[in-house]
Swiss-Prot record:
Family: Belongs to the oxygen-dependent FAD-linked oxidoreductase family.
Keywords assigned by UniProt, alphabetized: Alkaloid metabolism, FAD, Flavoprotein, Oxidoreductase
GO biological process: indole alkaloid biosynthetic process
Pathway(s) of this molecule: Alkaloid biosynthesis; ergot alkaloid biosynthesis
Pfam families xref list: BBE, FAD_binding_4
Function: FAD-linked oxidoreductase; part of the gene cluster that mediates the biosynthesis of fungal ergot alkaloid. DmaW catalyzes the first step of ergot alkaloid biosynthesis by condensing dimethylallyl diphosphate (DMAP) and tryptophan to form 4-dimethylallyl-L-tryptophan. The second step is catalyzed by the methyltransferase easF that methylates 4-dimethylallyl-L-tryptophan in the presence of S-adenosyl-L-methionine, resulting in the formation of 4-dimethylallyl-L-abrine.
Cofactor(s) recorded in Swiss-Prot or TrEMBL: FAD
Designated name of the protein: FAD-linked oxidoreductase easE
EC id: 1.-.-.-
Domain FAD-binding PCMH-type: 129-313
GO molecular function: FAD binding; oxidoreductase activity
Length: 612
């Protein structure tokens, strides 16, 4: 059968599917199932080739990157290269067949993975499997190619995955038997000295437009050369316009002073489920704009670029305090944490942000550091004296600490612009977050209560806990920025981020997730039990109450918008808006297994009749 006949056959099959979906079971609508490779209605090689031509040859058939280290595909040179590159976060961001760590590359069992972390030398290994790595990737380079990819996925009922840099800690950047749109090559960057939206004369000030694939570190460097600071995260290989800017956009450096990323986004360009390319801002498609400002990435469409405010670069002094104690001395460690959290509380009142980082070392010593960001300051001597006065009680409880301050002519030089190099450890990570209210943090006993909980939190070597400073403009922006974030963000002061190390086995992942959900998260939520708020971008992958802790009262409206813009659920995002209607991998609507079987049978029958 030639390509044209194949395409005509596919359209006939679609018509049959529409007919049966409408009349087979009238009480359950819409009927939506996704096609799997073993089914006759999976796109044929001719259809994949035709689609590849439509996107200028940008389609890749994916295998796990480590397959070159396994039989029967063993290639020593390629395997050597892989082992050399595998710890480079920049390489991982650009490669559609890997994620930032192995945790969500693997399936549910040992025969659903192709690990590279356990390989130390390029010797032929056995048992490489696809796992959760998508089967195909459209490595798009234009919005028009994104449109073609979305239409292809919709036409053929494919499980669609949107991937930028592969940083998602809940597995949203991969899925078994899926078709990936890889947005990392959308690399436009354009600065505007005085932005005005199309159709408006109102000045919005300096801004930058970035393609979906632009990473934080690259944007930081470009902005610094232009004399600007950008509100972004700590990791330089996170994509700016993807999950970061659609899921909230917490900045460890600037949120206290400038708010959240969603507060400062001015416009999105997006390909919706029907394959249309739209602009969403305060003047057009306002409902969609509201949903994209906090509703989560990969949910309402494929964002191809975004425009956000930038801020004049300023001088700054950064003060860092380091302290360490054995885990066996919990009382002094609790007091030490309380002292530095009291210092953070005091400095927050003067709009000085800070970030606490707690790590457990292999020798089971616990170490903490806290950085304070004094913007528009240059006098290190004065700041050191103030810091010493805030830390006096550390001497009383006999905790040794070091204090160092440095003045920067431009605060942007503090931003990390060099891609991460993964550690030599073979573990991956999962993450979770809990917000602390301003009411608790600013109370007289708040820092002590938080310190006690953090000191008692069971942590293992490789685990990390750090805070992100909210409050300030995060709270006041609630009066002027209409976003879909949980309303409680406008009453939050700190975000506790817990990163849990996962050993290199499926069993380790299962145990780590169970411990995170059932032990550590309840302990963190108990700090401020009436303020149950979490950050979806770094949320517990097993969060059962995700609608409430991520969006609260905004979830109902978000769900309605999802139904209007993507009624068939083409864009599935784990623990995302509308995901409760689907199974855990987004392959089939819940409670429709019988319908799925019937439609699959009819589709297979129709395919065999047309192609037979």
């Amino acid at each position: 059968m030639n390509s044209n006949s194949q395409i005509r056959s596919s359209r006939l099959i679609e018509a049959l599917h529409a007919y049966y979906s409408k009349y087979l079971v009238v009480t359950i609508r819409p009927i939506r199932y996704l096609v799997e490779p073993w089914q006759p209605c999976w796109p044929s090689e001719e259809l994949w080739n035709s689609f590849n031509t439509s996107i200028d040859g940008k389609l890749q058939q994916l295998k796990p990157a480590a397959h070159v280290c396994y039989e029967p595909n063993f290639d020593k040179g390629a395997c050597d290269d892989l082992l050399r590159l595998s710890r480079d976060s920049g390489w991982r961001a650009s490669h559609p067949g890997v994620l930032q760590d192995w945790v969500w590359e693997a399936g549910e069992s040992a025969n659903e993975t192709c690990p590279m972390g356990s390989l130390q030398t390029a010797t032929a290994a056995k048992s490489c499997h696809q796992g959760r790595i998508p089967l195909y990737s459209a490595t798009v380079e234009s919005a028009q190619q994104v449109q073609q990819a979305v239409r292809f996925a919709r036409r053929h009922n494919l499980r669609l995955v949107i991937r930028n840099t592969g940083h998602d800690l809940a597995g949203r950047s991969s899925a078994p038997d899926s078709f990936q749109i890889h947005t990392h090559r959308l690399q436009e960057t354009q600065f505007h000295t005085d932005l005005r939206l199309n159709g408006s004369t109102a000045s919005l000030g300096p801004a930058v437009t970035v393609g979906a694939g632009v990473m934080m570190g690259n944007l930081y460097a470009r902005a610094a050369r232009e004399g600007y600071m950008v509100l972004g995260g700590d990791c330089p290989t996170v994509g700016v316009a993807g999950g970061f800017l659609q899921g909230g956009g917490v900045s460890d450096f600037l949120s206290l002073n400038q708010g959240l990323g969603v507060d400062n986004v001015l416009e999105y360009e997006i390909v919706t489920a029907d394959g249309e390319l739209l602009v969403a801002n305060t003047l057009q498609n306002q409902e969609l704009f509201w949903a994209l400002r906090g509703g989560g990435g990969g949910t309402f469409g494929v964002v191809t670029r975004a425009t956000m405010r930038v801020f004049p670069d300023v001088p700054a002094v950064i003060s860092e305090v380091l302290l360490q104690a054995p885990q066996t001395n919990s009382s002094s460690w609790t007091e030490g944490l309380s002292v530095i959290l009291n210092a953070l509380q005091s400095l927050n009142r003067d709009d000085v942000g800070g970030q606490l980082v707690i790590a457990v070392q292999p020798e089971l010593a616990v170490q903490a550091s806290i950085k304070f960001f004094f913007l528009n300051s240059t006098e290190t001597t004065i700041i050191d004296e103030r810091m010493k006065s805030l830390l006096t009680d550390l001497n009383r409880i006999d905790i040794q600490y070091t204090l160092s301050s440095k003045a920067l002519p431009h605060f942007s030089s503090n931003y990390r612009q060099v891609p991460d190099i993964h550690s030599d450890n073979d573990y991956g990570v999962i993450g979770s977050t809990v917000a602390i209210s301003k009411e608790l943090f600013d109370s007289s006993q708040g820092p002590q209560k938080i310190a006690r909980a953090l000191a008692n939190l069971p942590m293992s070597p490789g685990d990390l806990l750090f805070t992100s400073n909210l409050g300030g403009r995060v709270i006041s922006n609630g009066e002027i920025a209409e976003t879909s974030m949980h309303p409680a963000w406008r009453a939050a002061s700190q975000l506790l981020n817990y990163i849990h190390a996962v050993g290199p086995s499926i069993e380790s992942r299962v145990n780590a997730l169970e411990r995170l959900t059932n032990v550590q998260m309840p302990m963190l939520y108990a700090i401020d039990p009436n303020f149950r708020l979490s950050y979806r971008n770094v949320g517990d992958p097993n969060e059962k109450d995700f609608q409430q802790v991520y969006w609260g009262s905004n979830y109902k409206r978000l769900s309605q918008i999802k139904k209007r813009w993507d009624s068939d659920g083409l864009f599935f995002s784990k623990l995302g808006v509308g995901s409760e209607l689907w199974d855990s991998e987004g392959m089939c609507r819940k409670n429709q297994s019988v319908v799925r079987q019937a439609v699959n049978y009819l589709m297979s029958f129709a395919t065999s009749m047309v192609e037979g």
